[in-house]
Amino acid sequence: MNLTRQERRRRERQAYKDSRKKDSDTYEMSIKLLQPWSTPIMKTELPPKILQTMTEISDQVIADKDAESWGKNLAGQINTELLIEHDILNQTGMMAFFLGAVRQFVITCKCQQMPFYSEAIQKEEWITQMLSMWIVSQYPNEYNPAHLHTQCQVSTVMYLKVPEMLPSRKKHRDKDDGSILFFGNASRDIDLSVPQLVCEPEVGDFYIFGAHQQHAVYPFRCAEGQKEIERRSISFNAIFQSKTDYDRGKKNEVPQAAVRPGESRPT
């Protein structure tokens, strides 16, 4: 069969397309990213009911002239840092919520730490206990220098109030002012990772991270004469242990002074 030049070229183009289509077949594959050498930062949002309750609790504590200042135990260059007693958390049901959140974080981290034992980790019972919880009522020009938390294993921060802030002076650094900064040291690969994470706070944001995770909080500025200038957050520290280890008598090496009698019951 004699083909015209035009028909021959058409068939050649079609054959080329068919070969490309065959080479570009897609496949469903199960993928796991294995990263046992770093502790994740878990970010979520407080349910509206939890956010409202914690805001009301913080309002009560700040209004209480006899509230205990917790600043002597903290790194922040911040004037108002107040302790929240565990009784009110138990009475409002907040304690159970936060211990459950810590438990989920621990399970997630343990599964990443030992990815080939994730099934056993998820079947394990994990005991969590809250140590101290405190309010950080931050105002313009106050800040938290780089630091970590000691005598605990897990730390958190939740944001209850975030004021309108003046924009950063430099457009190429527009996310610095008022942000929380997490530092990492697990990877030197600058092509596929970065050594720090800058997070702009929003009302309801809730972060859970390892207690030895270095972090800092940048100061911020507000417009002159602005009325609402408070950035309010709440943090707490916690410890955990597997029920298996607890039953074996392998208790955490945490000084007894870290948990005052009656502060929190393991759950």
Spans of features found by a protein language model:
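Short Lys/Arg-rich cationic patches that frequently serve as NLS/NoLS or arginine-rich RNA/DNA-binding motifs
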Residues: 2-21, 261, 266
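Non-heme Fe(II)/2-oxoglutarate
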Residues: 20-123, 141-144
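Short regulatory "switch" loops immediately downstream of catalytic or recognition motifs
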Residues: 106-113, 160-168, 220-223
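Catalytic core of non-heme Fe(II) oxygenases with the double-stranded beta-helix
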Residues: 129-208, 218, 229-230, 244-247
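Short, charged beta-turn/beta-strand-edge "cap" motif at the junction between a beta-strand
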Residues: 212-216
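C-terminal/domain-terminus segments
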Residues: 221-239
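Double-stranded beta-helix
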Residues: 233-267
